[in-house]
From Swiss-Prot:
NAD(+) binds at residues 13-14, 35, 80, 315. It holds the Pfam family Gp_dh_N. The keyword Nucleotidyltransferase does not apply. Gene3D superfamilies: Dihydrodipicolinate Reductase, domain 2, NAD(P)-binding Rossmann-like Domain. It is an enzyme of class 1 (oxidoreductase). The active site is at residue 151. GO terms for biological process: glucose metabolic process; glycolytic process. This is Glyceraldehyde-3-phosphate dehydrogenase. CDD domains: GAPDH_I_C (cd18126), GAPDH_I_N (cd05214). Belongs to the glyceraldehyde-3-phosphate dehydrogenase family. GO terms for molecular function: glyceraldehyde-3-phosphate dehydrogenase (NAD+) (phosphorylating) activity; NAD binding; NADP binding. NCBIfam families: GAPDH-I.
Length: 337
């Protein structure tokens, strides 16, 4: 199958990292980008130089209002209204909606007016069907607007699926120790709804909320209402880690649980879930393409029915790679109909 042609709306952290990943993805070709807040020259600069992921591995140039990536022209638009972005003219059948603004079906479907056939929201959505690769992508129903949930959900869900399928989760608590993101402050500033969230990101550990456990209940219905959790925002630029503590129905030793996760990582969830016994720290995970990297040495169990599991994720790179994998899956299903 020829590479699917994709447009990106929103050239922030996820938009640019999706683009970088797409250069390496055989099934995807980025043909257009839209961002109303930056000009083409600046977009080229931000794509080329990245403080976390380094210099772009390829050639970037500008031709008028367009980007030229490794000799291929990529249309660049600066429209504020997604309904007027001419996706059809560019050949983009699929759009990655990565502004963080148009996260409902009603808002995201505006892209269809410009000629896009499908929209994938790279964020949680209040009403769009959510799919997580390795967990529930096979239930894709052809909806025109879908969500890939959050980076934390993409880390948590595969791990929870393995444990629930094998041992049945009774209940659980999750904490994500999460790197700071663009919505946080470089210095203390106003944040009316979340006072602590307005404190400087580089100096503080900041308790916060996360919708990831609730989202897991949507992609794994058997876990609906069984998980809840929180976030601790920490002063690191990238890579986060999930701490999942669960009570399980079928008792198992920690070694048995590790083996079950290892088998899943080397089998049906390969490329989504990984297993390691190395003594990693967070920066070692930068650029890791997996959604969830289970740290066998970091977990502990109190007894055979109560266990804490730890799993890393590059909240930018790994998540962006799954966006492309979900796109490829959706396109394959669409083509078979």
């Amino acid at each position: 199958m020829a590479p699917i042609k994709v447009g990106i709306n929103g050239f922030g952290r996820i938009g640019r990292i999706v683009f970088r990943n797409a250069v390496e993805h055989p099934d995807v070709e980025i043909v257009a980008v839209n961002d109303p807040f930056i000009e083409t020259k600046y977009a080229a600069y931000m794509l080329k130089y990245d403080s976390t992921h380094g210099i772009f591995n390829g050639e970037i140039a500008q031709d008028g209002n367009d980007l030229v990536i490794n000799g291929k022209k990529v249309k660049f638009y600066t429209e504020r209204d997604p309904a007027v972005i001419p996706w059809k003219e560019t050949g983009a059948d699929y759009v990655v909606e990565s502004t963080g603004v148009f996260t409902t079906i009603d808002k995201a479907k505006a892209h269809l007016q410009g000629g896009a056939k499908k929209v994938i929201i790279s964020a949680p959505s209040a009403d769009a069907p959510m799919y997580v690769m390795g967990v529930n992508e096979k239930s894709y129903d052809g909806s025109a607007v879908i969500s890939q949930a959050s980076c934390t959900t993409n880390c948590l869900a595969p791990l929870a699926k393995v444990i629930n399928d094998k041992y049945t989760i009774i209940e659980g608590l999750m904490t994500t120790v999460h790197s700071y993101t663009a919505t946080q402050k470089t210095v203390d500033g106003p944040s009316a709804k979340d006072w602590r969230g307005g404190r400087t990101a580089a100096q503080n550990i900041i308790p916060s909320s996360t919708g990831a456990p609730k989202a897991v209940g949507k992609v794994i219905p058997e876990l609906n209402g069984k998980l809840t959790g929180m976030s601790m925002r920490v002063p690191t630029a990238n890579v986060s880690v999930v701490d999942l503590t669960v009570r399980i129905e079928k008792g198992a030793t920690y070694d048995e649980i590790k083996q079950a996760i290892k088998e899943a990582a080397e089998g049906p969830l390969k490329g989504v879930l990984a297993y390691t016994e190395d003594d990693f720290v967070s920066t070692d995970m930068i650029g890791n393409p997996n959604s969830s990297i289970f740290d066998a040495k970091a977990g502990i169990s109190l007894n055979n029915n109560f266990v804490k599991l730890v799993s890393w994720y590059d909240n930018e790179w790994g998540y962006s790679r799954r966006v492309l994998d979900l796109l490829a899956h959706v396109a394959k299903v669409d083509a078979s109909k």
